[in-house]
Amino acid sequence: MMMEHKANMAMVFVQIVYAGMPLLSKVAISQGTNPFVFVFYRQAFAALALSPFAFFLESSKSSPLSFILLLKIFFISLCGLTLSLNLYYVAIENTTATFAAATTNAIPSITFVLALLFRLETVTLKKSHGVAKVTGSMVGMLGALVFAFVKGPSLINHYNSSTIPNGTVPSTKNSVKGSITMLAANTCWCLWIIMQSKVMKEYPAKLRLVALQCLFSCIQSAVWAVAVNRNPSVWKIEFGLPLLSMAYCGIMVTGLTYWLQVWAIEKKGPVFTALYTPLALILTCIVSSFLFKETFYLGSVGGAVLLVCGLYLGLWGKTKEEEIQRYGEKQSQKEIIEEVIIV
């Protein structure tokens, strides 16, 4: 019972941390922080925070790094971290913090579709769990599109308020651009998830692998930022909210929540951790309503409902499939034992 409470509290804390990421990032970008420079500093904080723990805690799991493996890690970092995060922060500049939180609920759906395309996932439409996985993915992706592009009547409108921070209310044109960019960022992240599973089989030291990817991403982001913006003044970060946002995203989001999720997955399984994903969306919606005075439309609410329904439907299908597989394995082992006894 105590373990159950600890796992629940850990996952609630993780989602609170995740909810803070788009909110703080939005404020920092709105105050003039260059999004590409933001990614560089975020990854630098992450690499510095993870490296000592990776060195001391996983010394027994260290395995040799071949040139080919190092090259794989470099390109995975480029696609999944550097490209994904840079697109994410460009999107944050042109959309709302709520949309950024909402689209994370579509990640399982996008990952499932990509896994099917790469033949890493199988589905049986003759079984209820197979239908649930496909339907959940379709509903989740539909929810992301509805949230992004369907407005309808406004439910909460604060735009007439004089307390809105400058630059936090995107225009319609920028909202469309930001929505498409955010979906592209999530797609890159989903590709990272798929590629990560293969590399982890070759390099089992998880924390060292993440620390190495953060280091590569930091270097790549520096090159990207210099190539896009040659103005040296963009690298100067004043002590305040922008610096706090970078440290928060690097240390708290990439560092602390990683360990909490790994611990929860070991204790309760991956489905348990995924069930808490919509909590970040709810928290972000509440805070954004007061902080950024966001307008909430009926279409946004409908899209959020579809996202959450698609997430849970897909998770149910995946859980059911795993239960059937475990039952099949137990039956096979039982038959083998019976045959041995007979012989």
Curated annotation (Swiss-Prot):
One cellular component term from this protein's GO annotations in UniProt: membrane
Localization in the cell: Membrane
Family: Belongs to the drug/metabolite transporter (DMT) superfamily. Plant drug/metabolite exporter (P-DME) (TC 2.A.7.4) family.
A GO term, aspect molecular function: transmembrane transporter activity
Source superkingdom: Eukaryota
Membrane topology: Multi-pass membrane protein
Taxonomic source organism: Arabidopsis thaliana
InterPro entries: EamA_dom, WAT1-related
Pfam families linked: EamA (PF00892)
Keywords: Membrane, Repeat, Transmembrane, Transmembrane helix
Annotated EamA domain residues: 16-139, 188-313
Primary localization class, coarse: membrane
Protein's UniProt name: WAT1-related protein At1g43650
Transmembrane segments: 9-29, 36-56, 65-85, 98-118, 130-150, 175-195, 209-229, 239-259, 272-292, 296-316
Record keyword Endoplasmic reticulum present: no
Keyword Ribosomal protein among record annotations: no
